């Protein structure tokens, strides 16, 4: 990994492969790193952002790594995409500080994430209207957003793949299996399913709203998350992680 980043903290598989919707044409690989001391000082002195984000393509792999400070700031917003990266179970590289980042991510799971899931699903549903509900991959992404949000708001569990959503009462095996079949066989969605899916999306939207209103999660990332983020940032820029 040092080909791509000076000091990696962790590297994981993210995106569609993590969701259980693999795309044979590309694989999303994400990670976090710290800068070497000279570059860290330079960025502080000149308020620059050199190597804040490292983006490389190699083969079909899209590799993106975020400087630790940026990664932690995104977690604390909170940003569901970054929580998902931090908690990915498809780990390619893990330093001894990876668990610290995961601990911070867990403490950023809160009700505010509702706005991410709602904001992700609604625009995609409008896109589906334009596409006449023909693209199974887009429909699966919408389902995943609703399922992830409902599960998290109800139980506090932040999961990413479809197999983790089967515990939900609202999970529809028939629709999910059919859409996966359409995606694998590269065929459009049958008219008989389109009306059913559209109605199902409406039901899931209502369930997401109800889960938000009734959720026992904290409203914002915890103070513990903020304190631990500061402690980790200080530690990693004054301690050699190469050991």
Curated annotation (Swiss-Prot):
Matches recorded under InterPro entries: RlaP
PANTHER family attached to this UniProt entry: NUCLEOTIDYLTRANSFERASE
Protein name as catalogued: Uncharacterized protein MJ0002
Species the sequence originates in: Methanocaldococcus jannaschii (strain ATCC 43067 / DSM 2661 / JAL-1 / JCM 10045 / NBRC 100440) (Methanococcus jannaschii)
């Amino acid at each position: 990994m040092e080909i791509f980043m000076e000091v990696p903290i962790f590297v994981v598989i993210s995106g569609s492969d993590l969701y259980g919707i693999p795309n044979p044409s590309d694989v999303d690989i994400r990670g976090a790193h710290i800068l070497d001391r000279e570059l860290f000082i330079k960025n502080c002195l000149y308020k620059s952002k050199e190597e804040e984000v490292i983006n490389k393509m190699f083969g079909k792999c899209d590799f993106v790594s975020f400087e630790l400070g940026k990664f932690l700031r995104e977690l604390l917003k909170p940003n569901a995409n970054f929580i998902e990266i931090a908690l990915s179970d498809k780990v390619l590289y893990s330093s001894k500080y990876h668990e610290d980042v995961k601990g911070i991510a867990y403490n950023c799971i809160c009700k505010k994430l509702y706005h991410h899931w709602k904001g992700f699903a609604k625009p995609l549903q409008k896109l589906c209207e334009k596409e006449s509900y023909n693209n199974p991959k887009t429909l699966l992404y919408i389902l995943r957003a609703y399922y992830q949000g409902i599960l998290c708001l109800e139980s506090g569990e932040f999961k990413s793949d479809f197999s983790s959503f089967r515990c939900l009462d609202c999970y529809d095996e028939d629709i999910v299996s059919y859409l996966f079949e359409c995606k694998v066989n590269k065929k459009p969605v049958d008219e008989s399913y389109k009306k059913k899916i559209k109605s199902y999306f409406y039901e899931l939207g209502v369930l997401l709203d109800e889960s938000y209103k009734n959720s026992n999660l904290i409203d914002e990332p915890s103070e513990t998350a903020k304190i631990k983020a500061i402690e980790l940032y200080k530690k990693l820029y004054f301690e050699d992680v190469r050991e």
